[in-house]
Structures are given as C-alpha cells and as structure tokens.
Amino acid sequence: MSQVSLPSQLKETGPRLQSRCRSSARSERIFGGYNTSDIYSMAFDEMFDVQGNVRGPYKGIYAELAPSDASELKARAEALARAFIDQGITFSLSGQERPFPLDLVPRVISASEWSRLERGITQRVKALEMYLDDIYGDQEILRDGVIPRRLITSCEHFHRQAVGIIPPNGVRIHVAGIDLIRDDSGNFRVLEDNLRSPSGVSYVMENRRTIARVFPNLFATHRVRAVDDYASHLLRALRNSAATNEADPTVVVLTPGVANAAYFEHSLLARQMGVELVEGRDLFCRDNQVYMCTTEGERQVDVIYRRIDDAFLDPLQFRADSVLGVAGLVNAARAGNVVISSAIGNGVGDDKLVYTYVPTMMEYYLREKPLLANVDTLRCWLDDERQEVLDRIHDLVLKPVEGSGGYGIVFGPDASEKELAAASKKIRDDPRSWIAQPVMELSTVPTQVGSTLAPRYVDLRPFAVNDGNDVWVLPGGLTRVALVEGSRVVNSSQGGGSKDTWVLAPHASYGARELGAAEIVCSLPQSSPDPVPDGSPRPKQQPQQAQAEQAQQPQQQIMLP
C-alpha cells in the first residue's frame, strides 16, 4: 500500500527539524495565540498545562508541529483529507454520503492513564452485564429495592420478549461503547453507556491508517498501541457465544442496508472478520433455526451480530411492518439455536435515566466503588430533583432520555426564555423523559483551524469486547471533536469531526502490542467500501430503504446523544 503523497518539503520530518533553524515567529504562526480566548480558559487542555508547558505524552507531536508554517500545516491537512476521500470514508445523513472530518493532531493518552481507564471501563461492563442478567432473570435488584421497579417497567427498551433467552456463555454485552469526557480538573467521567450496537470503531481503524501515512516518522518515535486487531477480538467473542456448531459456528453481520448511517462500518467489520454481510431478506427461519440463502444452498446460522434495532428485528415480536429483520428470529434465540449479539433488550442498560443508577449497581453486584465517576445528573422523574431543575433551568443542560445525535438538547445558558419555557413544559408533562446536567467543561486538544492550531472540545468513546472469559478494551477509541468554536456538540451531523487516539505502550510491556508506521500501513486491510447499488441491478423495496434510514438507534450513529 502506497503512502500519501506529500509535498517534497514535508517528506522529511525529524532530521529536517533538527537541521533547519526556524524563527520563533514561524512557531507563533502555528501555536501563536493558542488558548487566549475566554471560551476555553477554564477547560483542561491535554497538550499544555496551566503554565503553558507541553505535557509529557505530547512532546513528540509538539516538536513535529511547532516549527511548521501555515503552508506546511495546510499541505498536511490536504494530504489527510485526500487520503480520507480516497478510502471512501463517509457517514450517511438523510440518505446522503458525507465525509467524516479527521483532524491533523492526534490525541495522546499515556500508558498509566490508559491503565486506569481500562480498569474503570472493565468494571462498568461487568456490572452492567450482571444487571442485565438479573433484570431478565430473577430481578433481585428490584426485589431488594436497590433501584425502583418502575424505572424498568417505564423504560421503552425493556422487552419482555427477551425474558427466557439465556445466552449460552452468559454474555449479553458483546460490545460496549462507553462515552467519556474529561472535566476541568482533568478527571475522566462517564457520560453515557452504549450497550446495543455502539458505532464508530471503523473510524478508529481508518483514522489510524490515515495518520500513519501522513506522519510516518511520529510512529517511529512513539510507542503507539495497535488498534487493527479489534475485528479478531470481536470475532472471538462472537464465536465463543455460539451454542450450536461450537467447533466452527457460522457468524454473520446483519445490516439494515446501504441506506443506514453506519453501513460503511458494517461492511468493513464483516470483511475484516471474514464473515458474510447479510440483510434480513437473506435469512429465514424454519423449525426455530435460522438459515442463510447462499449460492450453494441453505446454510444454518449460529451467531448474528446485528446492527438493527430491536424494534425492527422480528416482525412477529416487534414492529409488524418491519422488512429489515427476520420473522421467527426471537423464538429461534429462545430455543437456543441462534445467538443474537448484542442481546435483545440491552437498551434497558443504557437508558439515560438508568445511567444514573449504574454506580449503585456496581456497589450492589460487585461490592466496589466506581473507578470512573458519572457526570452529576438530576433526574426529572423525582419530585425534588425536578423542582431543582426547574429552579436552575438557566444554568443546566437538559437532555431527552431518548435523544440522540445531539438533537433535542437544551443548553440553559444559551437558550431563549421561549425555549426554556417550552422545555419546562415538556419536563412537567413527561418527567421520565428528561434528565439535567451541569454545563461541563470538556477537555481540549489542539485542532487545525484554518492556518493555525486552536483548542477544541473533545470526548472519547472506548470500545470494550466481552468474550465470556475476559473484557478487552481497544487501546484508544474514537475521539470526537467539536470543530465549531465554543460548541460542545461533537456529533458529525452537527459539524463535529474525529481524531486519531494514541495510547502509548509502557516501556516494559509484553502484553501491549505496538506497531511502527510501516507495519501499520502494510498490515491494515484495505477498506474500500462495498459497491452501492445504483438501483437497477438490485431492486430494493421502498419500505426497506425508509426503515434502513429510520433504524438508526443512538449507538448506530457516530454521534453523542
């Protein structure tokens, strides 16, 4: 695989920087005036400390970028953009393919800091796994009064159809995406749990490939942990979950189709795992078993990694008009003849109101204090907390429990009196559907803005894979960046982008694999997207296309709810 073509003056990096003298004025053109705006004055900057010194993990990146002038910064940014376009990396919004902007400056996390995050994410996934097993089983946490029963019965993602479906190896959460932010003290906090079909891991892998091409020398001087083995961990988890044909189970990826926002990711993961990418019309059920139609005839399916929301999964159990799912799929799962990943009904674990009780779950199931704290949250369904929200509505961020993509959020300090009055009415009319949080100062990372670098808010979505024996956390995750000045909305649909996330390996590490740039560029599989039908060779029903666009639950979008 060839590397991205850069202008000749950019092809050498380290030696060139040492041999050529640069004036301080040139450095000022890149970092000059960095973080002088009051907008980010209270935020924790991940590259610079409060005295303006470069933090340890970023010293190499700073040394590479600081001597550059505006033309060099622009050249690298253009090379980066070309690479993304050439690789066909897009997301779908309202049926239109759009590029997903990748910023030039990676986000760097030290080995020790990542170790703490890894432990906290693993703890959280284990507690949520125990909670889901309990909720769809004996419901001891409800009988003991630890959380209120009406919290579950009022959750639209609690599905009684899932009762009695017991995962063969006890795993319901095969993949989790735990959204994190960093507060003004530099502490990571959990913003949200995504336990259904968390999206975005394809961009993690593609970001790495692209940055490795544009900054090959940086990978030679940094011990960056690899991300290209995600698909192998996911495949192991899926195969381990099989109840039938355990020695050689047939695994498929079930997609709503090309109109879905995350179709690029569905096809990429299927290719990397070496399994079939199927739509609902490719599968059928007979005698409580699931079969796939192939050119060689019927083939029994043992594990379905579905990227379809519960509501569209089985028209006999959920939406009767669904053309995306497979009739009889739920009964086949209940009979133990197929495993659906992630499990039906997992949404009762990532409801935004349920999120507020996760620390309580950890103490109940694990007898442990949370290693990663939640963001402080007021629950509008509780009378006293609802009144506090209404009293402080000008100072809070109001979030719909079922919101996604950043839509429906009301930022109290920025809202008009009319908007706040409308929000107050919604809260009074349906308090179960709203939570409120303080305006959080997200951390910032230098981001290309025109011909210079400026701070922009970021979040992080690490991905955890549970294979039944261990919870493995992909080193890094998807860093999303709010490209609009002052905005805290990182969603791609509202002007957000992403960054490559580097987790540095410890100096004496035997279990943490790292790659140099050459190996990264050569080893990552090609990821050109599957050809999209133009409408003539492959007829598509109109309801299917409409539902494929509609069936984009929060975890299927590259977005923060």
From Swiss-Prot:
Provenance organism: Mycobacterium leprae (strain TN)
UniProt feature, compositional bias: Low complexity: 541-561
Biased segments, Polar residues type: 1-11
Gene3D superfamilies the record matches: 3.30.1490.270, 3.40.50.11290
Similarity comment text for this entry: To Synechocystis PCC 6803 sll0335 and to M.tuberculosis Rv2567.
Entry-linked InterPro entries: ATP-dep_Glu-Cys_Ligase-2 (IPR051680), CP_ATPgrasp (IPR007302), UCP005522 (IPR016450)
Disordered: region residues: 1-22, 522-561
Protein's name according to its UniProt entry: Uncharacterized protein ML0605
PANTHER family cross-referenced by the UniProt entry: BLR5612 PROTEIN, SLL1039 PROTEIN
